[in-house]
Amino acid sequence: MKHWLMKSEPDTFSWDHLVEKKRSMWDGVRNHMAAAHMREMKKGDLVFFYHSNIGKEIVGVMRVEKEHYPDPTDETAKFVVVDVVPVKPFKKPVTLAEIKANKKFADMRLVTHSRLSVSPVSEAHWAAICKMGGVTP
């Protein structure tokens, strides 16, 4: 199983929206590297839900429920979606500032490729961020 991070602007689609819907298609990704990461995702992979722009924080854990398929909102047919379900909210959101302040995250894609909306997360980073958020990995 791999771990990932996916970003969403909370005024467009937030953690609370996902919890309310219980399952959602993660659409609208138009970056080729991010889309390549989505193609690598497998059912059961765990994903951090990151609120971008507003908050700039990891707020919960999702699970990939359905592997990639064509994004119905993409007229070019180049991009894909995955379906995700909420697993658990963080007891304490982990902010981007906290992550950047800790040297052990210096090589995390969230820090090194800040505009990338979908990125892999190493086992060590996953465990450390879960601990910071007050949840078990």
Question: PLM features: what roles do these ranges have?
Answer:
Residues L5-K7, F49-Y50, V61:
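Short, conserved beta-strand edge motifs with alternating hydrophobic and charged residues
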Residues G28-H32, K66-P70, K103-K104:
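Short acidic (Asp/Glu) patches
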Residues Y50-K56:
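Short, charged beta-turn/beta-strand-edge "cap" motif at the junction between a beta-strand
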Residues M1-K43, T136-P137:
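Compositionally biased, charged N-terminal/linker segments
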Residues M1-P10, D71-P137:
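Contiguous surface segments at macromolecular interaction interfaces
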Residues E57-E67:
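Short beta-strand-centered aromatic/proline hotspots
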Residues H17, M41-K42, E57, E75-A77:
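Short glycine/proline-enriched turns and hinge-like loops at secondary-structure junctions
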